[in-house]
């Protein structure tokens, strides 16, 4: 059996880790052991934040919708209720984009949602 020397493979692995650690501060960018830990931690953060990104963007769309809908005299929750009752199925991202780029079209959607809501006289908004 021939002897296998692993210098080339280990060098390639080290290069790969150091390339991923590029831009890190201190020994994290040039010491293999520390760089490997930093890169792995970075990957954990990236995995976690790919999930959080979805939550964050949904929250942003809801905030934008709430602000846009209040200009038309509704709250976000009443608006969503009105959309459901009127049978309009549009996601929050699309509604948010509509509110920003097509205010006239968004106003029409809000009016449809308002029309589907029962008129509540006991509560003066």
From Swiss-Prot:
Show the GO MF annotations.
rRNA binding; structural constituent of ribosome
Pfam families xref list: Ribosomal_L20
Q: Which InterPro entries match?
A: Ribosomal_bL20 (IPR005813), RIBOSOMAL_L20_CS (IPR049946), Ribosomal_protein_bL20_C (IPR035566)
The record's annotation in CDD domains points to: Ribosomal_L20 (cd07026)
UniProt record, GO biological process: ribosomal large subunit assembly; translation
Q: Which family does it belong to?
A: Belongs to the bacterial ribosomal protein bL20 family.
Which NCBIfam families does this chain map to? Answer: rplT_bact
Q: What is this protein called?
A: Large ribosomal subunit protein bL20
Q: Which organism is it from?
A: Methylobacterium radiotolerans (strain ATCC 27329 / DSM 1819 / JCM 2831 / NBRC 15690 / NCIMB 10815 / 0-1)
């Amino acid at each position: 059996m021939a002897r296998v020397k692993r210098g080339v493979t280990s060098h390639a692995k080290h290069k790969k880790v150091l390339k991923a650690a590029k831009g890190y501060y201190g020994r994290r960018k040039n010491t293999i052991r520390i760089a490997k830990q930093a890169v792995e931690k970075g990957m954990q953060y990236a995995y976690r934040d790919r999930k959080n990104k979805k939550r964050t963007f949904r929250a942003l769309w809801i905030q934008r919708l709430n602000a846009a809908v209040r200009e038309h005299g509704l709250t976000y929750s009443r608006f969503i209720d009105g959309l459901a009752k009127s049978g309009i199925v549009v996601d929050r991202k699309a509604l948010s984009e509509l509110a920003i780029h097509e205010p006239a079209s968004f106003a029409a959607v809000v009016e449809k949602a308002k029309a589907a809501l029962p008129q509540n006289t006991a509560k003066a908004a």
